């Protein structure tokens, strides 16, 4: 493990301006070419990458996340950053999965307290994320497949894991974790609000510089 899981509250300097920015951008869902082009499999809608839509905000957000790990270093990075919006009607749990990137970050922008992110570990070491599971996950999100058969497949897969950490989705909180960690959302809706769930999601593909990894340095003592 190179990146410890990390939670930071009051992350954005001006969350209201960030929310207003999201309202000015087009969101794309399962029927859009964008979704199929990148072979995406997620619930709800996303914007295009903010590196294209708003470069200054993209650099601000990604740099701010990396400063949580490397406060004194100048870091070069490659990352994807999106707004994601999930409708309040999406009253289903998500699929437990892994990301292919080095570091992931989720920033919660809406008032959903009960739809945070959870980390998991397999009950058996040989329960590995496979192409077959990934295809089922993507199909259920892409086709809005909420059938009993799809739910049974999701639950059968999710039941192979034990939850090791629940992070509530408090507004303006960022949660960072290694992409290889199994993670998921137990519920995309929350009893305290009927608004759509709005987040910023960031995937760091490459992080370079004169880096000392916190977990590695800790093990030297």
Residue ranges and their predicted role:
Residues 1-94, 117, 123, 132-135:
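Non-heme Fe(II)/2-oxoglutarate
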